[in-house]
Amino acid sequence: MRALLSVLLLGLITFSTPSLALFGKDQFNNSQNNSFGSSNDSFVPVDQAFPFNFYQQDDKLMLDWQVRDGYYLYQERLSVSGENISLGELQMENGTPHKDEFFGDVHIYTTPLFVNVPLDEWQEGARVIVQYQGCAKAGFCYPPETRIIPIDAFTASIADSAVATKPTQSTANNNQTNATSPTASTSVSSNNTPAPVTEQDSLAANLADNWWTPLLFLALGVGLAFTPCVLPMYPILTSIVLGSGKLSQRRALGLSLVYVQGMALTYTLLGLVVASAGMQFQAAMQHPYVLIGLSILFVTLALSMFGVYTLQLPSSVQTWLNNLSNKQQGGSSAGVFAMGAISGLVCSPCTTAPLSGALLYVAQSGDLLTGGIALYALAMGMGIPLILVAVFGNKLLPKAGGWMDRVKTLFGFILLAAPIFLLERILPEMWSTALWSALGIAAFGWLYHIKNSLEFGGWKQSAIGIIAVLGLFASAQPALNYWFGNHETQAQQTTVSFTRIANVAELEEQLALAKAAGKPVMLDFYADWCVACKEFEKYTFHDPKVEAKLQDFVLLQADVTKNQVQDIELLKHMNVLGLPTIEFWDAKGEHVSNARLTGFMQAEPFLEHINRF
């Protein structure tokens, strides 16, 4: 149903967040988990997966990670902070763009990583705290790692006065340090200086991963051009741009392209600015309060497209910008370019809401390249009708009419899709499905309502009516399945739940209770940063057959997201290298160590695995 909505709502996914990109789940299948063989042997300890070294040379600290084949480091999970010392901007290369179903657009390192950390204002007891996290491509993630590096005194003004210390293999210190001394912090996600050597490779990979974004923004721009606030202005705008006198088609084409490039420059700069801000707040964008706030904002923007109220720049600001634009000389390339750049700032009531939504999408992606190109494509789409009018005259433009209001309303439905995409991360699947159904019913109901008022009739009108009816049924089906489906299955879903444990003592207590009851135990180690843990929860544990079998188990879950002292002790107690890890005990209370599962496993092989108990 979602694919149908995306097509018929003209690019519904334009405002989708990076979190919609799906991992290919098959690649995470752990074939070794189909038997009780020890699957833990297939993953190495974190110090072997990401060997870490550092050395200090005067006022510079060099950090070095080697990345084992088949593993990767998260750029967004890498941070460097200082105690009793100030740190400059990190000098490092950007990671490779990577789409994650649960974490959205992230950047990863699959090759050795070198980071240069400038040091300044050394004080007694100075040290640098390095935090990082990585995963195996097979769907196995390590807990966040912390390395504490003591910093030797240095004299920044004398470059050659000190001799570089010997590269040192670091030792882990996973305890969080609560510093009472002055602290400087540098986050990799907000301070990156791309290395010139890898810039081309990074750009190519980014474009390859996001090839559809510019196309959808181009289509969005064309759609905005046909709203009632924009389309009637093109003939007037064309006369202003071209100036007085007759011009050849070639000259008219050139001037119109120059105007559109000026407008595209403004939009591109807007995209770069908000994408830069988005990189700093990318982690915060995942917080439920932020997601709810953004959803309310999108709904507010959508209401303006439905005509509930008018959303635009203050009239005084628009008047000032218009006067500034009118002072430019039409017919000259420089004047036309300036008019285009200024006009990009004049948001009409029809374009303010979609443009705001587009900027929010770009801000959440936190990707400079994608942000700049997407907004450039949006401006080019809006400029296509202007180019057509300038070259061929007004005869190519469709006549103004009620159809333009319908285009505006359609954009309102597209904007309403954005909050559903955002809220899917925090809402139960039942509620997100209900919201999608409600949006589909509203959109296709509106389409059926307006079919009789369309300018054309005959078989085209009938076809639209059929599409609307089919869309209504398709949209309502998921909600109907929840309301009138198999109540027995739904009852099973509500009875499967985990008991949370926080430390070793609570684990021992629950194991003793399960042994007394004669029931096997399953312990799931979970963390919010673990992608495969969320896949287990979404695709495996909610399978009806798996849920039925899990009724025979005592289900325990340890949430180690915060990586506190008690979490580390529990992980060490169970000899857990990373997540996801699932442990089993039989009905006699014996730990079945060779039944351990590491890495994602789909429902069918997981069911075969637990059926052995």
UniProtKB/Swiss-Prot annotation:
Q: Where is the Thioredoxin domain?
A: 468-613
Instruction: Please give the catalytic activity noted in the UniProt record.
Output: [protein]-dithiol + NAD(+) = [protein]-disulfide + NADH + H(+); [protein]-dithiol + NADP(+) = [protein]-disulfide + NADPH + H(+)
Q: Which NCBIfam families match?
A: PRK00293.1
List all membrane-crossing ranges. 215-237, 252-274, 287-309, 341-363, 370-392, 407-424, 431-448, 463-485
Which compartments is it annotated to reside in? Answer: Cell inner membrane
**What's the top EC group for this one?**
oxidoreductase
Q: Name one GO biological process term.
A: cytochrome complex assembly
- The entry's keywords: Cell inner membrane, Cell membrane, Cytochrome c-type biogenesis, Disulfide bond, Electron transport, Membrane, NAD, Oxidoreductase, Redox-active center, Signal, Transmembrane, Transmembrane helix, Transport
CDD domains associated with the record: DsbDgamma
Q: What is this protein called?
A: Thiol:disulfide interchange protein DsbD
Q: How does it sit in the membrane?
A: Multi-pass membrane protein
**Does Transmembrane show up as a keyword for this record?**
yes
Which PANTHER family does UniProt cross-reference here?
THIOL:DISULFIDE INTERCHANGE PROTEIN DSBD
- The segments labelled Disordered in the record are 166-197
Single GO cellular component term: plasma membrane
